[in-house]
Amino acid sequence: MQLVAYGAQDVYLTGNPQITFWKVTYRRHTNYAMESIEQTFNGQADFGRRVTCTVSRNGDLAFRTYLQVTLPEINQSMVTTDDEKNTTGCFARWLDCPGEQLISQVEVEIGGQRIDRQYGDWMHIWNQLTLTSEQEVGYNKMIGNTTQLTYLTDPSYAAVDGPCESSAPKQVCAPRNALPETTLYVPLQFWFCRNPGLALPLIALQYHEVKINLDLRPIDECLFAVNNTNSGSGSVKATTAYNQSLVAASLYVDYIFLDTDERRRMAQNPHEYLIEQLQFTGDESVGSSSNKIKLNFNHPCKELVWVVQPDANVDYCASLEGGQDLYHLFGAQPFNYSDALDSLPNALLAFSASARGADNVINSNLFDDAGAGAVDGATDEATNIGAGLAVDATSGSTVSDAGSFVLAETALTMHCWGENPVVTAKLQLNGQDRFSEREGTYFDLVQPFQHHTRHPDTGINVYSFALRPEEHQPSGTCNFSRIDNATLQLVLSNATVSGTATAKVRVYATNYNVLRVMSGMGGLAYSN
């Protein structure tokens, strides 16, 4: 009956059919092989240094590229007794997302010409917009955003498991008195890393070398390590911890090996690639509520992404001074783009007042405490957290050790911070409004909802000229090369710039360009 119930409208659906659901079809691909090969840097890669990797010609194409870096162990031997500082041990944590924070900037150059430059800050923002929920847990482990690395250590916690600590608990959930030596894998986001059709044709670049230059941040901007957690004033910096070096650092490149015919064509024929670049003209310091940010961009841009970060969020020096808010919150907050500090610190004691002391996790190395117990008072650290901040741990009941672990893991990507510093924003092109003035929430809620995979953290603002800016296929651009004067007008919240408070505005733009490869050399078709 269904088959014979056929009318004029069905012609639009099944007339002159082009496919069938009942016989699978597929397309044959060219033969190839892929292998990931380690590449070394020229010189010692360490905190605060710039190193270069010359990409060797191991294969025909270069595809996905990862930074592999091993963080040093930070343990209780890295503290010296100082009565004036009331030293009680080494309390340390890597700042959030250490793999991304470690990268100040990374750039790729071909034949001495810089083709693209990206930043750890941008990599964090991009993943906030594009990373799927299924990939989030694995990606966080790759870049070290785990409780093992970013939660505060304590001398009363269990030792790090290893050959010399046979009595240490094997469970990764047990709180530790040290930050373990850990290898991170940070995927780079260059155009050739994200799309196999844009893989870099090394076989066609016989006369031009491909180099990747990496600038690493100083350890002071990656680590929080103090001698005690209840100091009222003065420096409590655990100096020895800040003298550590990276254990190892290298790049892993996925090389593609082509079959004979395709390899010959790839080497002999000229190529044009539509590539994506990142533009960033540097931080702009602001101290008033109304600001005009000049956009010195070029080329057809897919979208604008901007953040406004209060300087108080990233005061690395203040975080090591007793009595300061960032000291009570255990370190600077480089990926906090809101107008207030994140008052949910990365420490077990934020969830259980008994965490700082001898409890079942430390004594038995297992979660034996099945229930919560009453607390008559709070520990020194819990009291200090509550001082002047939106956390009150001075009364109430603790939770079990297992509960503390579950809360810590759950809260790893949660935040108790402020609002979007951008109250309103407007883009002007050659003096004309590109759109009417909008509230800041439109740019960190509605625009990401329309154009991106994921809703980002508060304060990551987006305006997209494309329908699908995450895709390589162009779906809309604005050619900033043809615009003489582009201005982003921002009105900032009082919490961001009240009194003498200042902030940094960072505006990023993703654009298209053309990479031409011919006669063994490569270069951009359009310069700035």
Short names for language-model regions:
Residues 1-528:
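Short, low-complexity Pro/Thr/Gly
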